[in-house]
UniProtKB/Swiss-Prot annotation:
<protein>
    <recommendedName>
        <fullName>Small ribosomal subunit protein uS17</fullName>
    </recommendedName>
</protein>
<keyword id="KW-0699">rRNA-binding</keyword>
<dbReference type="GO" id="GO:0000028">
    <property type="term" value="P:ribosomal small subunit assembly"/>
</dbReference>
<dbReference type="GO" id="GO:0008270">
    <property type="term" value="F:zinc ion binding"/>
</dbReference>
<dbReference type="InterPro" id="IPR019984">
    <property type="entry name" value="Ribosomal_uS17_bact/chlr"/>
</dbReference>
<dbReference type="GO" id="GO:0046677">
    <property type="term" value="P:response to antibiotic"/>
</dbReference>
<dbReference type="GO" id="GO:0022627">
    <property type="term" value="C:cytosolic small ribosomal subunit"/>
</dbReference>
<comment type="subunit">
    <text>Part of the 30S ribosomal subunit.</text>
</comment>
<dbReference type="InterPro" id="IPR012340">
    <property type="entry name" value="NA-bd_OB-fold"/>
</dbReference>
<dbReference type="InterPro" id="IPR000266">
    <property type="entry name" value="Ribosomal_uS17"/>
</dbReference>
<dbReference type="Pfam" id="PF00366">
    <property type="entry name" value="Ribosomal_S17"/>
</dbReference>
<dbReference type="GO" id="GO:0003735">
    <property type="term" value="F:structural constituent of ribosome"/>
</dbReference>
<keyword id="KW-0694">RNA-binding</keyword>
<comment type="similarity">
    <text>Belongs to the universal ribosomal protein uS17 family.</text>
</comment>
<keyword id="KW-0687">Ribonucleoprotein</keyword>
<dbReference type="GO" id="GO:0019843">
    <property type="term" value="F:rRNA binding"/>
</dbReference>
<dbReference type="GO" id="GO:0005737">
    <property type="term" value="C:cytoplasm"/>
</dbReference>
C-alpha cells in the first residue's frame, strides 16, 4: 500500500471565507458514446492559513486530514498570482 499524498493544481474562484478558499480543478473526460472530450470542473474547499490567496490565483493544494465538514485540502503554494 502506498501512502502517496495527492497534490493538485487549480484556480481560486472564491476567497470570501476566513482562512478558506474554493479552488476549481478542471479535468477532461471522454464521453462514453461519442468520444468527445468534455471539460468537467470540481470545486474543493481548501484551508488557507495566512489568507494569502486572491480570486484568479493558480495554486497547488494537497490532501490532508478533515479540517471541517467540507475541508480536507490545504494550500501548499501560490503558483501564479492573478493579474488585475
Amino acid at each position: 500500500m502506498t501512502d502517496k499524498i495527492r497534490t493538485l493544481q487549480g484556480r481560486v474562484v472564491s476567497d470570501k471565507m476566513e482562512k478558506s478558499i474554493v479552488v476549481a480543478i478542471e479535468r477532461f473526460v471522454k464521453h462514453p458514446i461519442y468520444g468527445k472530450f468534455i471539460k468537467r470542473t470540481t470545486k474543493l474547499h481548501v484551508h488557507d492559513e495566512n489568507n494569502e490567496c486572491g480570486i484568479g490565483d493558480v495554486v497547488e493544494i494537497r490532501e490532508c486530514r478533515p479540517l471541517s465538514k467540507t475541508k480536507s485540502w490545504t494550500l501548499v503554494r501560490v503558483v501564479e498570482k492573478a493579474v488585475l
